[in-house]
C-alpha cells in the first residue's frame, strides 16, 4: 500500500511543506539547458531524508549542452526488494514576455489557493510533492521497498543528454527500476482524471525536392521543385494509415511546414522543403512507415532527399498490480476513477 500512503500523505497532511519546497524550485531559473542550482537544492533535501545521490552530468559547457541529471535512492535493507521510482525534470520552457504574466514566473507566488510560476505543474510541483511524501512516510516506518528519484534537466530540450543516458547508466550498473511514475501533468480538467499508460510513436522528417532555378516566363528551362513537393505531400496526405490498435488513437500524418526561402514571385526556386510528423500506434513501425513515404517519391521529375529528424517508438504499460493500486489510491484521495489513456504527445517515459 506504499503508493496509496504516499498519495495520502501528499494531499491530506503535507500540503504546506510541498508548497514551500515547490516555491524554492520555481525560483530557480532552470530554462533548458540551464540548471541554476535546482539539482543542488534537490540533493540537499534528499540527503537529509536518507537518500544517496548519484550525479550524472552529460554534455559540455563548451557546446552549451551540459545537462545536470540526478539519480537518488533510499535503499531498503530487505534483500531482493523492488524499487519504486519517480521520474521528473527540473528544466522548464522559456517564460516568454514576463509582462504578460500576472505574477513573476520565477517567484512562486501563492494566490487564490494556487501556486503560480513556470514549472508549477510541469513539473517542479510534482517533484516537490514526491520528495515531501517520501520524507513524511520514511519518518514513520521502515519500508520493504526502495524509493528512488530520477531527475533530468533535458526534458524540454532535445532530450539527448537526459533520461535516455541516465537509463543507460542504470542498466550498465545493473540498477533496476521495477515500477516508475512519471510526474507529467496528465489531467485535462481535474486532479485524478487520467493516467497515461502509453504513447503513440512519433516520426519527424523532412522531404526536400531539388529542381532547377529559372524564370517563370521560361518554365521549359527550369524544373519546379514546389510542384514536385506538392505532389508528394498530396500523396502522403492520402496515405491509408487506418490500422487500428487497441487502447491507442488513430495514426495521423501532418505536414507542418513547406518552405522555399524564395521571396520573389517571378523566380522558380532551386529547392523546396517540407517538415512532416507522423504519430503512429503499435500496428506501425519506422521501417513500414518509411517504405510508404518513399513510395510517394515516384512520378516526380526532381531529386528527392529524405531526412529523419527524430524517431520515437510507441509504448504501452499493461495493467498490473502496481497500476491497479495507483488507480485505487487516486480514487481514495480524489473520489474520481482515473481513465487509462495513451493520448497526447511523447514523453521520456519511453526511455524508461
State what each model feature region is.
Residues 2-96, 271-275, 289-292:
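N-terminal helical capping/dimerization or prosegment-like subdomains
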Residues 13, 186-190, 197, 203-351:
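Metal-dependent amide/peptide-bond hydrolase catalytic core
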Residues 24, 131-139, 231-238:
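Short glycine/serine- and small hydrophobic-enriched flexible loop segments
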Residues 50-59, 107-110, 303-307, 333-340:
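Short secondary-structure junctions
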Residues 81-148, 172-173:
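Active-site metal-coordination/substrate-binding segment of hydrolases
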Residues 108, 154, 214:
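Acyl-CoA/ACP chain-elongation machinery
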Residues 123-198:
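Acidic/histidine-rich catalytic neighborhood of metal-dependent amide-processing enzymes
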Amino acid at each position: 500500500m506504499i503508493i496509496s500512503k504516499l498519495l495520502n500523505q501528499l494531499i491530506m497532511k503535507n500540503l504546506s511543506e510541498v508548497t514551500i519546497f515547490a516555491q524554492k524550485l520555481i525560483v530557480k531559473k532552470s530554462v533548458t539547458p540551464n540548471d541554476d542550482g535546482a539539482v543542488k537544492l534537490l540533493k540537499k533535501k534528499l540527503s537529509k531524508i536518507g537518500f544517496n545521490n548519484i550525479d550524472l552530468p552529460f554534455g559540455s559547457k563548451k557546446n552549451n549542452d551540459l545537462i545536470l541529471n540526478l539519480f537518488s535512492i533510499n535503499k531498503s535493507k530487505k534483500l531482493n526488494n523492488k524499487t519504486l521510482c519517480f521520474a521528473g525534470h527540473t528544466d522548464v520552457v522559456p517564460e516568454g514576455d514576463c509582462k504578460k504574466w500576472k505574477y513573476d514566473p520565477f517567484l512562486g507566488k501563492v494566490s487564490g489557493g494556487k501556486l503560480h510560476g513556470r514549472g508549477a505543474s510541469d513539473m517542479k510541483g510534482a517533484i516537490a510533492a514526491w520528495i515531501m511524501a517520501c520524507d513524511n512516510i520514511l519518518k514513520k516506518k521502515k519500508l520493504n521497498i526502495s524509493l528512488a528519484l530520477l531527475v533530468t534537466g533535458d526534458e524540454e530540450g532535445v532530450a539527448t543528454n537526459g533520461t535516455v543516458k541516465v537509463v543507460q547508466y542504470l542498466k550498465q550498473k545493473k540498477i533496476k527500476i521495477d515500477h516508475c511514475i512519471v510526474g507529467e501533468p496528465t489531467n485535462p480538467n481535474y486532479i485524478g482524471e487520467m493516467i497515461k499508460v502509453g504513447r503513440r510513436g512519433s516520426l519527424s522528417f523532412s522531404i526536400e525536392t531539388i529542381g532547377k532555378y529559372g524564370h517563370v516566363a521560361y518554365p521549359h528551362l527550369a524544373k519546379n521543385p514546389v510542384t514536385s513537393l506538392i505532389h508528394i505531400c498530396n500523396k502522403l496526405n492520402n496515405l491509408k494509415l487506418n490500422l487500428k490498435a487497441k487502447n491507442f488513437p488513430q495514426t495521423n500524418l501532418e505536414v507542418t511546414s513547406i518552405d522555399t526561402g524564395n521571396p520573389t514571385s517571378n523566380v522558380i526556386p532551386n529547392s523546396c522543403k517540407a517538415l512532416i510528423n507522423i504519430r503512429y500506434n503499435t500496428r506501425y513501425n519506422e521501417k513500414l512507415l518509411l517504405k510508404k513515404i518513399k513510395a510517394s517519391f515516384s512520378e516526380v521529375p526532381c531529386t528527392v532527399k529524405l531526412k529523419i529528424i527524430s524517431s520515437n517508438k510507441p509504448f504501452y504499460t499493461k495493467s498490473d498490480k502496481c497500476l491497479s493500486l495507483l488507480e485505487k489510491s487516486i480514487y481514495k484521495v480524489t473520489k474520481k476513477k482515473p481513465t487509462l489513456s495513451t493520448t497526447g504527445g511523447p514523453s521520456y517515459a519511453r526511455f524508461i
